[in-house]
Amino acid sequence: TPPKQDIIRLGIGHVTQPLPKACIEAMHKAVEELASKDTFRGYGPEQGYDFLIEAIIKNDFAPRGIHFSPSEIFVNDGAKSDTGNIGDILRHDNSVGVTDPIYPVYIDSNVMCGRAGVLEEGTGKWSNVTYMPCTSENDFIPEIPDKRIDIVYLCYPNNPTGTTLTKPELKKWVDYALAND
């Protein structure tokens, strides 16, 4: 059943709840530590503080029966910067494919590095980006392209549709990537 209200934007979301008390307390403590010469630490390790990595393993993964070593956990400053930075290891002339709708950063990061081509007037789409429609007709799961695409952004659970892929559905994409290596 379609929603009774118009959809305004399916891009970057907006928070709906205030920060939890534990976060506020931790931020205040960190600010106090940064304000004193005795407790000031400067920049943290680029892979994340050991205490944070251990806490992630202990409190997030271990209760679900998932076991990681600290070297397998990477702490970053958010998806946007990592999504943008991954392009640094890719070729400038790689072709790009995105699900549509898509988290805007996947396109924006390719625009900034010159990989997206020319913005087509009227459509708002980029000439060197293959848009793979995700609609109710295909259960918001894109078709495997019939041409080679060098970089395909798959984000599941999908933002903004919430769709997930099964292992067999993901295997189709792995097979596509291997066939187009």
Model-derived segments and their meaning:
Residues 1-33:
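Conserved N-terminal helix/loop that builds the PLP phosphate-binding region
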Residues 32-33, 38-180:
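Conserved core of the PLP fold type I
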